[in-house]
């Protein structure tokens, strides 16, 4: 009786979650289908849900209209560099706040926490003035460096590092390990799951970054995918099937990366959430 009552109780919840899931995934499905439609299929009425024929030429036209491969390369390069630098800084900061003692530790920790509530739009003007004053506009350094500080990934790793027993660190010190050796052989080795989740989060954030690359790139060859799609919209005019094809190619790597790392991401977020 208890199990039967539980099933009946969960059914409305299941139906609501199913409905919400369908609503959330519908735009993605529509984008995928529209990417293969002809211009006539897009504008036909009543709505044609499936393409009359799969127009693979839509993807070819995108490459002809804008330097899409260049946008891809810029996005991959800047995202990888930003992620690597951000994770390296987050690991170092998390280790210090989780396991070391130093003056004003609590004050600095509160400052880092408060930085999570400062939106990027507030910092855009001073950051742009700094980048422009140092001549880094239209350079990879200008895109990468202002975005390498990751408060969220730092807080995530701090929460995870505090779960590592101090006995492991004490044993490493007895064996003659210094701070950097402990960081590598104890903290990082035992935090692969959390670091993987932080890498995934940082990479996704930098890949879809739009505002900052838009401000510091004036040359076509320096644009990233997010910025390049904006200019494709003006070039493609009313050819929505080309916009959908470009959008699909832009998010394909993100989908692949997330599918490969999804288990680590969920596991790490659950563990750090419980600890916090």
Enumerate the predicted regions with their spans.
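A structural signal for multi-pass alpha-helical bundles of membrane permease subunits
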Residues: 2-276
């Amino acid at each position: 009786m208890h199990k039967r009552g539980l099933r009946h109780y969960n059914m409305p919840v299941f139906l609501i979650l199913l409905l919400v899931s369908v609503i959330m995934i519908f735009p993605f499905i529509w984008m995928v289908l529209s990417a293969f439609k002809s211009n006539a299929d897009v504008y036909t009425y009543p709505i044609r849900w499936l393409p009359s024929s799969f127009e693979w030429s839509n993807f070819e036209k995108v490459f002809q209209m804008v330097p899409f491969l260049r946008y891809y390369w810029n996005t991959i390069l800047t995202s990888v560099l930003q992620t690597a630098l951000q994770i390296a800084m987050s690991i170092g900061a998390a280790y210090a706040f989780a396991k070391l003692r130093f003056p004003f530790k609590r004050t600095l920790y509160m400052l880092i926490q408060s930085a999570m509530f400062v939106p990027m739009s507030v910092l855009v003007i001073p950051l742009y003035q700094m980048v422009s004053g140092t001549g880094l506009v239209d350079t990879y350094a200008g895109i990468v460096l202002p975005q390498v500080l990751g408060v969220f990934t730092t807080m995530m790793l701090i929460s995870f590092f505090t779960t590592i027993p101090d006995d492991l660190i004490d044993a490493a010190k007895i064996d003659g390990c210094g701070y950097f050796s402990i960081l590598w052989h104890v903290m990082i080795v035992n935090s692969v799951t959390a670091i993987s989740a932080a890498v995934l989060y940082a990479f996704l954030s930098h890949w879809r970054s739009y505002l900052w690359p838009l401000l510091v790139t004036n040359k076509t060859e320096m644009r990233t995918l997010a910025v390049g799609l904006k200019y494709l919209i003006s070039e493609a005019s009313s050819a929505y099937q080309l916009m959908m094809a470009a959008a699909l190619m832009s998010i394909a790597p993100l989908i692949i990366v997330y599918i490969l790392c999804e288990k680590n991401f969920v596991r790490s977020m659950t563990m750090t959430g419980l600890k916090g």
